Amino acid sequence: MQKLRAAWHAHLPYDASIPLNQRRWITGEGSLTARLMSASAAFRVRRLAQAPQLPLADEWRALGLIRPLPAITREVLLICDETPAVFAHTIVDPRYARRDWPFLRGLGNRPLGGALFVDPRVRRDPFQFARLTPCHPLRQALQRVLPALSSEPMLPARRSVFRRGGGAMLVTEVFLPDLLTRAAPENTGAGGTRLPRRIDTHHTPSKQEERPES
């Protein structure tokens, strides 16, 4: 029976089936967006949804909430050369969203990393790592957009909490098969880099993308 919950670990478990190149993608620090742009000729973000919803139990605990509250939830695909590379799921502590993450409302199809890694007030907690089965809620959300991925038994994922002022933001990144075949660029380091201007934000939005942001 497949698990609906993921076991998150402080370190990526050693597994001979995970090639070194894949481990570099999964464990690399700094801005993942910058690394994706370095590894592709064209990069863009497709926003799938942005609306309040209840986070998973392990998510609201990771944010330090004492009970579940509807949180601003943003889901996007990071696309390299017109092929989805990463599914990103972000939830924001609703108590401090407007004060500490004011840019989130107008982000649209721009990358979150472009705002996080240029702000010296943002701090990032250490990564946690997991493998998500097709029954996991985040896999289910992904598979509604990319149903072919339901045949993948496990997809590697990582998450970390970003902090700014009193606010917390949990970002989970699910690595898709196409990305893991690409050569991983050099690590940008813990602080990340200022992002190059090579992002296509002028594409036709889906109906989900046209929903007003909350």
From Swiss-Prot:
Keywords: Cytoplasm, Lyase, Pyruvate, Ubiquinone biosynthesis. One of its GO terms (molecular function) is chorismate lyase activity. It catalyses: chorismate = 4-hydroxybenzoate + pyruvate. One of its GO terms (cellular component) is cytosol. Pathway: Cofactor biosynthesis; ubiquinone biosynthesis. Belongs to the UbiC family. This is Probable chorismate pyruvate-lyase. It comes from Cupriavidus metallidurans (strain ATCC 43123 / DSM 2839 / NBRC 102507 / CH34) (Ralstonia metallidurans). The gene is ubiC.
